[in-house]
Design a protein with these regions (language model features):
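A conserved short coil-to-beta-strand element within the FAD-binding core of flavoproteins
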Residues: 1, 87-98
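Rossmann-like dinucleotide/flavin-binding elements
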Residues: 1-66, 102-115, 119-165
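N-terminal Rossmann-like dinucleotide/flavin-binding domain of flavoprotein oxidoreductases
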Residues: 64-92
Length: 165
């Protein structure tokens, strides 16, 4: 049994948030591969805890999954606190504390950090739903197995599916 669970610390979200300002298992310079919802919110979280971040995004735009107002606020906050954000990047290697990449115009470059986090997105796994549908069962996909998004959308879709069943 871990010490945190013995004293109830890990049961308290508030306690965990406070502790994350004191200690985290990440270095001071963090490279985040992926500039979508997860990558940008992680960058924002880490900056609030005194980390330097560099976000590498393969696409041309950052935070496409975020609402416009939220995206603007996160991008502004990351930039305002010295976060580096690069788009059109193809990561070619992760070697120790260095991430090598190629820019959209073919230039090779690298960035160094103490920690690397992969936040390059997720793809829904539809195999179970597809197999059940193929077996003749009525399947309604909701949440991230339908499309990536916020929990509110998944809850609303589940409510609709329940009413229509």
């Amino acid at each position: 049994m871990k010490a945190g669970s013995l004293i109830g610390v890990t049961d308290s979200t508030e306690a965990m948030q406070k502790l994350s300002h004191v200690w985290m298992p990440l270095g001071k310079r963090v490279i985040i591969i992926g500039g979508g919802l997860v990558g940008l919110e992680l960058a924002e979280f880490l900056i609030a805890r005194g980390r330097q971040v560099c976000v590498l995004e393969s696409g041309t735009h950052l935070g496409r999954e975020l609402s416009i107002v939220r995206r603007w606020r996160v991008l502004h906050g990351v930039a305002e606190h010295g976060g580096q954000m690069l788009t059109g990047i193809t990561v070619t290697a992760i070697e120790g504390n260095r991430v090598r990449y190629q820019t959209a115009d073919g230039q090779s470059a690298d960035v160094r950090g103490d920690s690397v986090v992969l936040a390059s997105g997720a793809m829904p796994d539809t195999r179970l739903g597809d197999a059940l549908s193929s077996a003749g069962l009525n399947v309604t996909s909701i949440g991230d197995c339908q499309s990536l998004g916020y929990i509110e959308g998944a809850i609303a879709a589940g409510h609709r599916a329940g009413r229509e069943a």
